[in-house]
Amino acid sequence: MNDSPVLVVGLGNPGPKYVGTRHNIGFEVVEELVGRNYANFSVHKRSNTEIAQLPGLIVAKPRSFMNLSGTPIRALCDFFKISPANVLVVHDELDLDFGQVKLRQGGGDHGHNGLKSTSRSLGTKDYWKLSVGIGRPPGRMDPATFVLKPFSKQEQDSVPIMAADAADLIEEHIRTL
């Protein structure tokens, strides 16, 4: 790993209204990662985020809405001098079955507005993305409505396991850098 820290950002929407929704699975993953390292988040005013600093790693939750996530991510990169190649963004993914996780570098945003904002602000799509599968909406439900709904009672039991699996994958990935 080079001298630059790795920035891991969980995407989600701020506020109690969005806690437990599919769109906030990125927050759940980074909260798991920070919690297992006995660390805490604190406000980083210059970037409008909450961050936790671990050895060689900065973990963040933007305090902006999902569609505006790129601005605080860019502010963190500038403040901590982190290149996009050392950024990993954790996000919900409609095109993966519930519970699946997939790590990739670069590539498209799959219509995800948080990733679009991040790519626009970083000036590149060449950063790491950890997609956490939330599945497709049932029937003809609008995907925008689906992602803002809480997980079903049946799914809620699996969310901590999903978050732990995703956090495991992040830790494995960081060891390879």
Swiss-Prot record:
<keyword id="KW-0378">Hydrolase</keyword>
<dbReference type="InterPro" id="IPR036416">
    <property type="entry name" value="Pept_tRNA_hydro_sf"/>
</dbReference>
<dbReference type="InterPro" id="IPR001328">
    <property type="entry name" value="Pept_tRNA_hydro"/>
</dbReference>
<dbReference type="InterPro" id="IPR018171">
    <property type="entry name" value="Pept_tRNA_hydro_CS"/>
</dbReference>
<dbReference type="GO" id="GO:0005737">
    <property type="term" value="C:cytoplasm"/>
</dbReference>
<feature type="site" description="Discriminates between blocked and unblocked aminoacyl-tRNA">
    <location>
        <position position="13"/>
    </location>
</feature>
<keyword id="KW-0820">tRNA-binding</keyword>
<dbReference type="GO" id="GO:0006515">
    <property type="term" value="P:protein quality control for misfolded or incompletely synthesized proteins"/>
</dbReference>
<dbReference type="GO" id="GO:0000049">
    <property type="term" value="F:tRNA binding"/>
</dbReference>
<feature type="active site" description="Proton acceptor">
    <location>
        <position position="23"/>
    </location>
</feature>
<comment type="function">
    <text>Catalyzes the release of premature peptidyl moieties from peptidyl-tRNA molecules trapped in stalled 50S ribosomal subunits, and thus maintains levels of free tRNAs and 50S ribosomes.</text>
</comment>
<comment type="function">
    <text>Hydrolyzes ribosome-free peptidyl-tRNAs (with 1 or more amino acids incorporated), which drop off the ribosome during protein synthesis, or as a result of ribosome stalling.</text>
</comment>
<dbReference type="GO" id="GO:0004045">
    <property type="term" value="F:peptidyl-tRNA hydrolase activity"/>
</dbReference>
<comment type="similarity">
    <text>Belongs to the PTH family.</text>
</comment>
<feature type="binding site">
    <location>
        <position position="18"/>
    </location>
    <ligand>
        <name>tRNA</name>
    </ligand>
</feature>
<feature type="site" description="Stabilizes the basic form of H active site to accept a proton">
    <location>
        <position position="92"/>
    </location>
</feature>
<feature type="binding site">
    <location>
        <position position="113"/>
    </location>
    <ligand>
        <name>tRNA</name>
    </ligand>
</feature>
<keyword id="KW-0694">RNA-binding</keyword>
<dbReference type="GO" id="GO:0072344">
    <property type="term" value="P:rescue of stalled ribosome"/>
</dbReference>
<keyword id="KW-0963">Cytoplasm</keyword>
<feature type="binding site">
    <location>
        <position position="67"/>
    </location>
    <ligand>
        <name>tRNA</name>
    </ligand>
</feature>
<feature type="binding site">
    <location>
        <position position="65"/>
    </location>
    <ligand>
        <name>tRNA</name>
    </ligand>
</feature>
<comment type="subunit">
    <text>Monomer.</text>
</comment>
<dbReference type="Pfam" id="PF01195">
    <property type="entry name" value="Pept_tRNA_hydro"/>
</dbReference>
<protein>
    <recommendedName>
        <fullName>Peptidyl-tRNA hydrolase</fullName>
        <ecNumber>3.1.1.29</ecNumber>
    </recommendedName>
</protein>
